[in-house]
């Protein structure tokens, strides 16, 4: 009869639907709440029929979800300091100076760090469950661990944080740009014939010459020429 065939059709449809329903364990970041959520979803295709919280999270899956979040959001999610960014730039300068040959300096560019999060960050994500917890991560230690001995010592020799100038001052180098910038009062360089170099003489620094009141006077990578031309002309 028509009713029995309709009922049979309904049963068949339910059976087909039941076969298509699958349970999916979903572990992802709740953007609105800023927390990690784990749930079991009953789905047909991409349609979610129901959700229920998952307890007893698998640690590796949990850490992978956090790594995926950092990869999606970028390294800015981590507690960088200006000092750590300077350290990263110093390492990368020495690596770039080795262009064309195998470098002993690891690739610590943002792209390389994002690609290797499982290696250097994932082992330390055990206590992260909220966005605010990222601020507690000691990423300085994690990244410094990527520099094997004796490279930390060589880093200080080849890409020093400070340069000694004739006045006796120890002036900080800024590695946030390439070439690194040495902002120094002109008077402190009296007696220095040419531009300071680092990295075993391979890298000339960029001098931002300042007045006694620390106002910009000149930007140069050729101090010898500055003494001969600009400075000599100004003295006339």
Model-assigned labels for residue ranges:
Residues 5-162, 202-236:
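Acidic, serine/threonine- and proline-rich low-complexity intrinsically disordered segments
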Residues 154-186:
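Amphipathic alpha-helical packing elements
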Residues 175-205, 209:
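Short, surface-exposed, low-complexity cationic segments
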């Amino acid at each position: 009869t028509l009713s029995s065939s309709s009922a049979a059709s309904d049963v068949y449809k339910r059976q087909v639907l039941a076969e298509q329903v699958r349970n999916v364990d979903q572990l992802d970041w709740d953007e609105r709440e800023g927390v990690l959520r784990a749930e079991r979803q009953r789905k047909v295709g991409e349609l979610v029929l129901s959700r229920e919280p998952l307890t007893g999270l698998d640690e590796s899956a949990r850490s992978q979800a956090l790594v995926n979040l950092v990869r999606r959001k970028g390294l800015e999610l981590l507690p960088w300091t200006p000092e750590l960014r300077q350290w990263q730039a110093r390492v990368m300068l020495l690596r770039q100076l080795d262009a064309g040959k195998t470098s002993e300096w690891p690739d610590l560019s943002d792209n390389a760090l994002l690609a290797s999060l499982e290696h250097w960050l994932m082992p330390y994500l055990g206590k992260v469950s909220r966005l605010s917890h990222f601020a507690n991560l000691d990423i300085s230690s994690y990244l410094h661990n990527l520099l094997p001995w004796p490279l930390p010592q060589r880093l200080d020799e080849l890409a020093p944080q400070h340069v000694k100038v004739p006045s006796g001052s120890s002036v900080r180098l800024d590695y946030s740009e390439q070439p690194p910038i040495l902002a120094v009062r002109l008077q402190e360089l009296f007696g220095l014939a040419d531009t300071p170099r680092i990295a075993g003489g391979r890298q000339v620094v960029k001098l931002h010459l300042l007045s006694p009141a620390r106002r910009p006077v000149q930007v140069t990578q050729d101090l010898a020429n500055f003494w001969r031309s600009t400075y000599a002309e100004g003295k006339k």
